[in-house]
Amino acid sequence: TLMNEYKDKIGEVIIGYYQRERNGNIYVDLGNAGKVEGYLPVKNQSKLEYYEKNDRIKALIVDIKPTNTGIQLILSRSDKKLVSSILEREVPEIGDGTVEIMSIVRDAGYRTKIAVYSKREEVDPVGACVGLKGVRIQNVIRELESEKIDVLKWDPDPTEFIKNALSPAQVDRVVILDAEKRQALAIVQDTQFSLAIGRQGQ
């Protein structure tokens, strides 16, 4: 059955085309003679994206529901797994396990921060993700409709990792307040403050 065919595809990326919109929710044509319909609810949409009839939509399958005519795939453009999936395709070093995505934080439509780690010293994880002249990361940005993407080096030392995470802001000092609760204080100059806290203090 279609349900069995697609249930293992949850977490995978699928491509379809904008069909219609109702109350902000988008219905996506996935082919298959209309038996498989894509549904992109408002809550799963990236805030700054706008679609018109027949626009191509690449999205993550997050759930499946039966319908009278077949099945409906619940899609997401805001899930951070969409970013990791696109990145895995663009960066061979992630695909073969040399570079590992350790963490992703995403404010869909605005900015994504990705922490990466290399299992081999001679491979720069950030450079691998960015690519020569930024080609690889530009392909990811294009797929996410120009969302800003920061790639940073993961570090097992929390102090160093926090400094990397707040880059490009210059951090003078990091004080670990509570390691168990993962609370820390980063000290920066006044001129670096807005850069460090990001949009609306994020």
List where the protein language model places each region:
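RNA-contacting regions in translation and RNA-metabolism proteins
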Residues: 1-202
